[in-house]
C-alpha cells in the first residue's frame, strides 16, 4: 500500500513538472506597430546602441531592458523565450533573419536614422580630412559600391582593395569598432570585415594613412576616442544629440532604421 501511494505521489509530481514545462514553452504573441507598444515588453538590445536608447525611453521600468554585449546573444535569448523581442538596426536584423527562419522582423516602428564616423571632440583637422575623403568617395561611386557589396543584389561583386600605388607615408590611424554588427563590421576567419571596415580603409587610403582596427564593446568606443586610445570610431553609429556631446561626427554615409524582432 505504501509503495502504491509513493508511486502515485511520484507520478503526480512528474505530471506537474511536465505541465509546468509545457506552460513555459508556450509562445507569447507579440504585436508591435509603434514605439509605445513596447511599454510592457521585456526587450533585448545590444548595450549602448541606438536600439538600447530608443527602447529605454518606452518601457515602464528599466528592469524590462535586457542588455547584451552582442546582438547575437540577444537573438539567442529571444529564441530561448527569455525576452519578448529584440530591437536592433535593420541590416544586422536582416542577417539574423536569414539565419533564423523562426524569427520575424517588424519594420516601420521607428524613424529612419543616419550613420556617420566619429572623432575626438574638437579634432577638426582630422574631421575635415575625413569629410573631404568621404566626399570624394561618394562622388566617384566608391561608397555605393562598398555598401552594395554587402547589401542588395550586388552582394559579393565588389570587394574594396587599396590601390596599388597608394601612399601610406603618414602615421597609422586607429579605428575603434565593435565587430558584432554584420554587415557593417563582423568577424570572418581571422579578420574583421564589413562596410565600415572597407569604407574606413578607403578613407585612409585617400588621406595617406594606414589603418589599424581596434575591436571593443560598443559603449567603449566614444570613451576610447576621448582618451586617445583610438583616432576615430566606425560602428554603424547613429548620429544623435547625446553622442554629439562627447564626439564630433563626419558627414553621414548610410541610412538605417531600428526594427523589432519577435518569434513567429
Language-model region placement:
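Extended ligand-binding regions for polar small-molecule ligands
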Residues: 23-24, 49, 116-156, 198-206, ...
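Beta->alpha turn/N-cap motifs
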Residues: 46-50, 70-71, 86-94, 140, ...
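Extracytoplasmic small-molecule ligand-binding "clamshell" domains
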Residues: 58, 64-67, 76, 85, ...
Amino acid at each position: 500500500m505504501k509503495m502504491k501511494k509513493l508511486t502515485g505521489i511520484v507520478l503526480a509530481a512528474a505530471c506537474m513538472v511536465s505541465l509546468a514545462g509545457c506552460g513555459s514553452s508556450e509562445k507569447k504573441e507579440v504585436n508591435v506597430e509603434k514605439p509605445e507598444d513596447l511599454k510592457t515588453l521585456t526587450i533585448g538590445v545590444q548595450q549602448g546602441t541606438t536600439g538600447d536608447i530608443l527602447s529605454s525611453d518606452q518601457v515602464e521600468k528599466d528592469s524590462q531592458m535586457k542588455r547584451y554585449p552582442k546582438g547575437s546573444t540577444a537573438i539567442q535569448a529571444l529564441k530561448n523565450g527569455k525576452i519578448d523581442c529584440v530591437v536592433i538596426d535593420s541590416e544586422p536584423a536582416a542577417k539574423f533573419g536569414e539565419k533564423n527562419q523562426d524569427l520575424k522582423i517588424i519594420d516601420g516602428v521607428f524613424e529612419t536614422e543616419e550613420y556617420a564616423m566619429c572623432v575626438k571632440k574638437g579634432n577638426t583637422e582630422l574631421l575635415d580630412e575625413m569629410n573631404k575623403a568621404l566626399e570624394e568617395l561618394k562622388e566617384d561611386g566608391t561608397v555605393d559600391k562598398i555598401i552594395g557589396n554587402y547589401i542588395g543584389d550586388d552582394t559579393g561583386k565588389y570587394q574594396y582593395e587599396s590601390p596599388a600605388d597608394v601612399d601610406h607615408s603618414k602615421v597609422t590611424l586607429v579605428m575603434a569598432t565593435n565587430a558584432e554588427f554584420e554587415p557593417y563590421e563582423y568577424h570572418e576567419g581571422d579578420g574583421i570585415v564589413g562596410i565600415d571596415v572597407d569604407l574606413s580603409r578607403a578613407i585612409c587610403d585617400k588621406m595617406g594613412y594606414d589603418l589599424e582596427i581596434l575591436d571593443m564593446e560598443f559603449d567603449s568606443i566614444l570613451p576610447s576616442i576621448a582618451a586617445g586610445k583610438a583616432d576615430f570610431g566606425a560602428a554603424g553609429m547613429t548620429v544623435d544629440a547625446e553622442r554629439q556631446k562627447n564626439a564630433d561626427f563626419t558627414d553621414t554615409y548610410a541610412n538605417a532604421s531600428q526594427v523589432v524582432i519577435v518569434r513567429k
